């Protein structure tokens, strides 16, 4: 993509332009920057997404100019915002969602985790042909569930360029999760580079964006702490497998900027509360690549819902979730301000927002934790999807049928005796 494709008017300095956009990513103040006669929307917005509700909703897919890093780029947006509008619907309703594609290429919207007829699922080549340029596709389905979900494009790299939004379905009856107020927190990642170029680089060199490779300094640290034999063996097994102990993600902050409801860490999304209120946070991982470790320093979170399903409440200090997952948590803030801190699993960056009693109050932002090397259990222990899967609890299951697995390759070979499966 040509960095000089879009130039600023001579009367506006680059410094002023970047400063003016520091609190938001999508251009709203400079409609003359947008090319005339194109599908671009010149009235785009960012931060907490606008909210749409009702039984009939209209969405428009278009291109918008964005600036998250000081560089103007083209995004794929729904109704001109990143994230796309939050859709707040009700269980039991039949909804009609009219989606118009103004792009020059096909597009689609997939309703992630929603029970519906396959024709409405929004996956091109599988459930329908896609939404062709200039066409309007009408999604119509009954809402058979409630909870926190999301929607996104299933075409090309459009999700990666901004086409995602929250989908909140209120229960038919009174919600058993009671809160004084709530906020949607949609975490995502953004790249200024052409996603196809990013993908092409990964195909040539899978670790090209991994800037946490083991170093000589790491070796001497292990040598000092664990001795020569341990330091060498720790590296030998990875070398023999031609793998890296820091292969935690395909991409990193070398390619990505991390967004919190469409806002960069500098922009600092903000949600207000009153002390003692119970606040519901609907976390959605809308990233294309990134696993986030989420915590709110000095404030515990009680997980009450996972992927739209109510769960037995569990109080945690931190949780990890990957692309496509959702968690609803309850918090009861007592101080003036808290930072919602979502650091990436490979520890190269973070998204963050603030909960506060007023707009002029901030909380400290913690430093990113040191990267942790993977262990063999991380790489192999969870790859089997049978009864030997390391993360599954089979303690309440009947004993498995005795089978001799010793001649089979794979993790199951280590558990030739069925009784050992009950340990996992």
Which residues are covered by each model-predicted region?
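C-terminal segment of N-terminal export signals and the immediately downstream linker at the start
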Residues: 10, 31-67
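N-terminal secretory signal peptides
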Residues: 1-13, 23
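Histidine- and aromatic-rich segments of cupredoxin/plastocyanin-like copper-binding domains
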Residues: 120-123, 129-132, 232-421
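Compositionally biased low-complexity segments at domain edges in trafficked proteins
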Residues: 181-209, 372-391
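Histidine- and aromatic-enriched segments that form or immediately flank copper-ligand environments
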Residues: 52-178, 250, 255, 282, ...
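Mobile cap/lid helix-loop segments that border enzyme active or cofactor-binding sites
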Residues: 72-73, 187-273
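...captures the hydrophobic TM-helix bundle architecture rather than a specific catalytic motif
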Residues: 19, 23-29, 189
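Conserved small/polar residues in nucleotide/adenosyl-binding loops
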Residues: 424
């Amino acid at each position: 993509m040509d960095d000089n494709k879009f130039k600023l008017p001579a009367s506006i300095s680059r410094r002023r332009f970047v400063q003016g956009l520091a609190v938001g990513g999508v251009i709203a103040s400079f409609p003359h920057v947008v090319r005339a006669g194109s599908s671009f929307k010149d009235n785009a917005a960012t931060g907490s997404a606008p909210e749409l509700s009702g039984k009939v909703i209209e969405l428009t897919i278009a291109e918008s100019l964005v600036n998250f890093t000081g560089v103007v780029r083209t995004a794929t947006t729904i109704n001109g915002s990143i994230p796309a509008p939050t859709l707040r619907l009700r269980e039991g309703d039949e909804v009609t969602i009219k989606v118009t594609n103004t792009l020059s290429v096909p597009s689609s919207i997939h309703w992630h985790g929603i029970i519906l007829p396959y024709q409405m699922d929004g996956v091109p080549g599988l459930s329908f042909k896609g939404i062709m340029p200039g066409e309007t596709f009408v999604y119509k389905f009954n809402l058979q569930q409630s909870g926190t979900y999301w929607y996104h494009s299933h075409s090309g790299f459009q999700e990666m360029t901004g086409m995602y939004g929250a989908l909140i379905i209120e229960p038919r009856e009174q919600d058993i999760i009671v809160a004084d107020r709530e906020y949607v927190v949609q975490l995502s990642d953004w790249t200024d580079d052409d996603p196809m170029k990013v993908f092409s680089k990964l195909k040539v060199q899978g670790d090209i964006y991994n800037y946490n490779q083991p170093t000589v300094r790491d070796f001497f640290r292990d040598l000092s702490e664990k001795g020569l034999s341990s330091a060498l063996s720790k590296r030998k097994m990875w070398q023999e497998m031609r793998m890296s102990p820091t292969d935690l993600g395909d991409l990193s902050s070398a390619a990505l900027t991390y967004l919190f409801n469409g806002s960069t860490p500098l922009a600092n999304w903000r949600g207000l509360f009153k002390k003692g209120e119970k606040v519901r946070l609907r976390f959605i991982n809308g990233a294309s690549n990134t696993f986030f470790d989420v915590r709110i320093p000095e404030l515990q979170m009680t997980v009450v819902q996972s992927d739209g399903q109510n769960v037995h409440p569990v109080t945690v200090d931190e949780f990890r979730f990957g692309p496509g997952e959702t968690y609803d948590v309850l918090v009861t803030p007592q101080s003036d301000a808290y930072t919602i801190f979502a650091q990436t699993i490979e520890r190269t960056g973070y998204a963050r927002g603030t909960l506060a009693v007023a707009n002029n109050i901030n909380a400290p932002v913690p430093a990113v934790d040191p990267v942790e090397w993977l262990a063999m259990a991380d790489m192999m222990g969870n790859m089997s999807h049978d009864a030997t899967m390391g993360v599954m609890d089979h303690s309440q299951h009947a004993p498995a049928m005795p089978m001799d697995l010793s001649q089979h390759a794979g993790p199951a070979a280590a558990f030739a005796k069925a009784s050992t499966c009950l340990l996992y």
